[in-house]
Amino acid sequence: MNITDPIADMLTRIRNANDTNKDVVNIPASNMKISIARILKEEGYIKDYKVIEKKPQNALRIYLKYSKNGEKVISGLKRISKPGLRVYVKKDEVPKVLGGLGIAVLSTSRGILTDKQARQEGIGGEVLCYVW
């Protein structure tokens, strides 16, 4: 099956698995999805991720994270830049999500970065999604 927007598909799979309190979600892998999973892990939104080698396409297994009383760590995921409407920001326009409580994931010339990292490096890019 051909997916028009693979990043939106990834976010939707994570959101659906999170809403049903699943521990694990499998997603078709790509380099960009692996980079987004790395950022989610670094920022503490997921426990871990693993690339599963299989034919014809590798899978990305994401282990979701919940608090000790069972509350979701990821309360929201939103796709910003879409194939039909790309959203780019300059270095001084990098957004803050919920006043700094969430993160914006950006695709920059230096790879996939969070909004904080992009501000520190002084670069803008394409706003892929918000996570809070």
UniProtKB/Swiss-Prot annotation:
Single GO term (MF): structural constituent of ribosome
Keywords attached to this entry: Ribonucleoprotein, Ribosomal protein, RNA-binding, rRNA-binding
Physiological role: One of the primary rRNA binding proteins, it binds directly to 16S rRNA central domain where it helps coordinate assembly of the platform of the 30S subunit.
Family: Belongs to the universal ribosomal protein uS8 family.
Superkingdom of this protein's organism: Bacteria
SUPFAM superfamilies on file: Ribosomal protein S8
Official protein name in the record: Small ribosomal subunit protein uS8
Gene that this sequence comes from: rpsH
Gene3D superfamilies reported in the protein's UniProt record: 3.30.1370.30, 3.30.1490.10
Organism: Halothermothrix orenii (strain H 168 / OCM 544 / DSM 9562)
